[in-house]
């Protein structure tokens, strides 16, 4: 296996993919909200890889090779990312690019 992509680079890649795909996958009101409030409250953060990914991608997820990034808005009162617009599973292996996103649904 090749060297894995750093977690910082995973977060950057996830955010770039999110920005590209958000207009086609989120409600227009959510896109406007995220865009308007990202400067003050926006976040893309690495979290513990969820156990439910196997149900979404159809294979066992190696938590060393794959990372989960959540993208959304942070609650200013408790500094918690509680308005999640997307969850992304992304491969850290540069030889096997892969990502799968779960989008916020109202």
Curated annotation (Swiss-Prot):
**Which species expresses this protein natively?**
Vibrio parahaemolyticus serotype O3:K6 (strain RIMD 2210633)
Q: Which domain of life is it from?
A: Bacteria
Q: List the residue ranges forming a coiled coil, or say none.
A: none
Q: What is this protein called?
A: Putative double-stranded DNA mimic protein VP1949
Q: Which family does it belong to?
A: Belongs to the putative dsDNA mimic protein family.
Concerning InterPro entries, the annotation shows: dsDNA_mimic_put (IPR007376), Put_dsDNA_mimic_sf (IPR036763)
Q: Name the Pfam families for this protein.
A: DUF440
Q: What does this protein do?
A: May act as a double-stranded DNA (dsDNA) mimic. Probably regulates the activity of a dsDNA-binding protein.
């Amino acid at each position: 296996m090749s060297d894995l992509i750093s977690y910082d680079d995973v977060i950057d890649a996830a955010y770039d993919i999110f920005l590209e795909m958000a207009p086609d996958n989120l409600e227009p009101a959510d896109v406007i909200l995220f865009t308007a409030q990202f400067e003050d409250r926006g976040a893309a953060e690495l979290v513990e890889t969820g156990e439910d990914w196997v149900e979404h991608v159809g294979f066992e997820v190696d938590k060393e090779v794959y990372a989960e990034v959540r993208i959304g808005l942070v609650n200013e009162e408790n500094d918690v990312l509680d308005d999640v617009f997307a969850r992304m599973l992304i491969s850290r292996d540069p030889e096997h690019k892969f990502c799968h996103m779960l989008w916020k649904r109202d």
